[in-house]
C-alpha cells in the first residue's frame, strides 16, 4: 500500500539537467506536483516544445524550460549564474543525466566510445556539480541519479559501470568536502519502468524519493530504490533521519 508522502516545495527552485529524458520526466512531474519551480535545460526549442507537450497539463507556470548547453564547464557555469540572477537563487539540483550503452568488451571499445560513454558524461556531471553546489541553499540538496551498474560489472557495457562508479565517488567526495554546509546524495536505481522500458521501479517512485531528499533535512548519503516498497521505505527513512 502506498502511504501519503506529499511534500510542499512551494517556491523551491530545482534545476533538473537531463529532465527531458525518460527518468527525468518522472522527476520533473514529481517536483511540479510538490509545487516547486522546476528549471529544465534542453538542447533546442523543438525539444522544449516536445517535452511540454509530453507533460500535458502537468506543464504549468512552475515549469521553466531553458535552451542551454550545460555539457561543458563554461556552459554549466553560465546556466547556473543565469538561474541565480533571474530566480534569486537555487535550492536543489537533481541530475538524471545519461543513458545506456552497449558496445562490446573493454578490449574492443574505440576512442569515440570512450569519449561518448565515459568522458563526456562524467564531464557533464562534474560541470553541473562544480557550478551549482556552491550556490545551493542550505535547505536544498544535490542529487545524482545512477543505476545498479555503478556497483556491479556489466560485461559488454563496462563503460557504463565505470562512469556510474565514478559518479558514486563524486558524490562521496562532494559530501565529504561539503560537511554540513551542503547535502549531497546518490539515488541508486534498479531497472526503471518508463515510457521507454519496463522495470521494477517506476519513474514516479524515483521522482517521489528525489522530492523527499530535497524536502527533508536528512544528511548526505546514498539511497537505493528498486521497487515501490523500497521507495516508500526510503521516504520514511529520510523523514526519520531529518528528525534525528
Residues of each region from the PLM?
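Flexible N-terminal pre-Rossmann segment of NAD(P)-dependent oxidoreductases
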Residues: 1-16, 240-244
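N-terminal Rossmann NAD(P)H-binding glycine-rich loop of SDR-like oxidoreductase domains
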Residues: 20, 28
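Conserved glycine-rich Rossmann-like NAD(P)H-binding loop of the short-chain dehydrogenase/reductase
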Residues: 35-50
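Rossmann-fold cofactor-recognition segment
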Residues: 55-74
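A glycine-rich helix->loop->beta "capping" turn
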Residues: 59-62, 81-95, 101-102, 218-219
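Conserved mid-core segment of classical short-chain dehydrogenase/reductases
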Residues: 98-113, 239
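Catalytic loop of short-chain dehydrogenase/reductase
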Residues: 107, 113-127, 138-176, 191-194
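C-terminal helical subdomain
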Residues: 172, 179-244
Amino acid at each position: 500500500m502506498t502511504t501519503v508522502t506529499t511534500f510542499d516545495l512551494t517556491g523551491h527552485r530545482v534545476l533538473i539537467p537531463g529532465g527531458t529524458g525518460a527518468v527525468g520526466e518522472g522527476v520533473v512531474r514529481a517536483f511540479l506536483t510538490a509545487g516547486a519551480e522546476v528549471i529544465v535545460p534542453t538542447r533546442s526549442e523543438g525539444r522544449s516544445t516536445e517535452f511540454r507537450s509530453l507533460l500535458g497539463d502537468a506543464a504549468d507556470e512552475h515549469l521553466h524550460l531553458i535552451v542551454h548547453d550545460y555539457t561543458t564547464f563554461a556552459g554549466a557555469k553560465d546556466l547556473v549564474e543565469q538561474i541565480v540572477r533571474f530566480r534569486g537563487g537555487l535550492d536543489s539540483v537533481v541530475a538524471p543525466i545519461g543513458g545506456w550503452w552497449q558496445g562490446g568488451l573493454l578490449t574492443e571499445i574505440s576512442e569515440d566510445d570512450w569519449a561518448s560513454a565515459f568522458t563526456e558524461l562524467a564531464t557533464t556531471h562534474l560541470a553541473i556539480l562544480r557550478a551549482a553546489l556552491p550556490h545551493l541553499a542550505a535547505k536544498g540538496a544535490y542529487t545524482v541519479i545512477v543505476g545498479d551498474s555503478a556497483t556491479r560489472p556489466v560485461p559488454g557495457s563496462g563503460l557504463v559501470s565505470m562512469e556510474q562508479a565514478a559518479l558514486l565517488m563524486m558524490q562521496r567526495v562532494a559530501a565529504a568536502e561539503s560537511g554540513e554546509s551542503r547535502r549531497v546524495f546518490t539515488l541508486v536505481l534498479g531497472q526503471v519502468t518508463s515510457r521507454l522500458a519496463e522495470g521494477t521501479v517506476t519513474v514516479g517512485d524515483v521522482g517521489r524519493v528525489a522530492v523527499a531528499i530535497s524536502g527533508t533535512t536528512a544528511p548526505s548519503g546514498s539511497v537505493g530504490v528498486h521497487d515501490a516498497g523500497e521507495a516508500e521505505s526510503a521516504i520514511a527513512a529520510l523523514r526519520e533521519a531529518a528528525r534525528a
